[in-house]
Amino acid sequence: MNNAANDGYGERYYRVLHAANDLKYFSVKIKESDLAIAVDRKSYSDSLLSLCQRELLGVRRQLEDYIKRHPEFMTSFVPLPLMVGAPEIACRMAAAAEKAGVGPMAAVAGAIAQSLGQALENQVQEVMVENGGDIYLLSKNDRVIAIFAGSSPFTYKIGIRVEPEESPLGICTSSATVGPSISLGRADAAVIKAYPAELADAV
């Protein structure tokens, strides 16, 4: 199920509408992972890009190595027990999957977003990491997250307000009509707020 070519999602066109002037935006991409990252302008430095690249490469390598040992982790639609020596990211995904009653890969985008966000927290005051519609947010200011729902008339007309005391927080979107991810539902956009981000993603 991949309609990215005709829904504007493949190039992440919705990202050009980022409107928080107090944040500095940059992106990191490795293989399937294509992340938009925002930090407060006072904290930004070019070194953050390298930090994010290293963190993304590291978590991907850990997960890929684990999947080589446990291929079912990649394909299962139901929760799975972990093999001995599973990396932290696989453990977090499996825990979220167990709570949601889904396969562990349902939590992968949120888990990666949170991994990068937490890697930045000691370097910045505020951070937002968006990974294919799944967001990890740590903010000291009110934020409104606009909902992208493809060709739906509600696209960009609905937003979710997040107050500082709610963060850190995961805000994750699932869609049956937008993007390459497998969806067993029918909604143009179903949005969940939860912590950690991998739980919001899995649900």
Regions from the language model: what does each represent?
Residues 2-4, 45-129, 193-203:
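Alpha/propeptide regions of enzymes that mature by internal proteolysis
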Residues 15-20, 126-127:
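Short, solvent-exposed secondary-structure boundary motifs
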Residues 11, 20-49, 67, 80-81, ...:
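A structural signal for small-residue-enriched, beta-sheet-centric alpha/beta enzyme cores
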Residues 1-16:
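Short, Gly/Pro- and small/polar-rich lid/capping loops
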Residues 12-15, 41, 54, 60-61, ...:
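Arginine residue identity/basic-tract feature
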Residues 98-178, 183, 193:
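Glycine-rich anion/phosphate-binding loop at the beta-strand->alpha-helix junction
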Residues 1, 40-56, 133-141, 156:
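Short, charge-rich amphipathic segments
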